[in-house]
Amino acid sequence: MSLITCEDLAFAYDGVTVLSHLNFKVEQGDYLCILGENGAGKSTLMKGLLGLKKPSAGNVAFGEDLRAKEIGYLPQQTPVQKDFPASVQEVVLSGCLSGMGMRPFYGKKEKARADRNMEALEITDLKDRCYRDLSGGQQQRVLLARALCATGKVILLDEPVAGLDPLVTINMYRLIERINKEMGITVIMVSHDMQAATKYASHILHLGEDRQLFFGTCEEYRHTAAFHTFMDGEKAVHIWKKAAGKEKKPRAANPEPETKREEQEKEVQQ
């Protein structure tokens, strides 16, 4: 049985349907990227998969060995969240809370899991630092480690590279790919980045006009009208930003980075 199966799924707000006729499956080991313009319903679908939004029609079915609370989630950060005054270790450990029941303290099992995930994401050297003092890329790694503490199966990522500079973005995409391929974690990611989606993902779900425009493999997607229309739109935005001087430029290398992670984030893809 598939990990997640959505059949004729629909969502509505105040009686107004915002998404309908969604039909797709997520298998173990998939890397699914959800694409679409702003307002296409991507975040609504994420809430539905997490059990935070009840469908107005259809059904979300989970495999026998998966429950909604076993899905790790990395949401987009708000300014308040970025200024959270806790240590990195405390933030990562909080990802274990959903599996602790009524137990009010972390045990050896949770601490070992947090240590493993911090090591896997190469942030062990940051464990005692305050979360709000970290760079944007470091904070995303911490939140990703937190999401992994909540699951060993599926993570949902809501635009995980939003606001990051180009070099840190490359490193983040590589890290997510490693989590998928080496750790065997199924990835479901919302993104506006068409090029990254078709490079790293195994499957694409394209939403638009309140419905599903495409679901299938990346190779199949490259031959659709939805792909070419969205790609042309991305190129137009890129040209406009470049002409207006609004594209982010890679930051100059820091001769004395505070940590090994900050130094690695500034490596240029060779």
What is the predicted role of each segment?
Residues 204-217:
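H-loop (His-switch) and adjacent beta-strand-loop-beta switch element
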Residues 155-158:
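Catalytic Walker B motif of ABC-type/P-loop ATPase nucleotide-binding domains
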Residues 166-168:
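Helix N-cap at the start of a conserved alpha-helix in ABC-type nucleotide-binding domains
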Residues 219, 223-270:
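ABC ATPase nucleotide-binding domains
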Residues 108-126:
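Conserved ABC ATPase "signature" region
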Residues 191-192:
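H-loop/switch region of ABC-family ATPase nucleotide-binding domains
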Residues 130-134, 138:
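Conserved ABC ATPase signature
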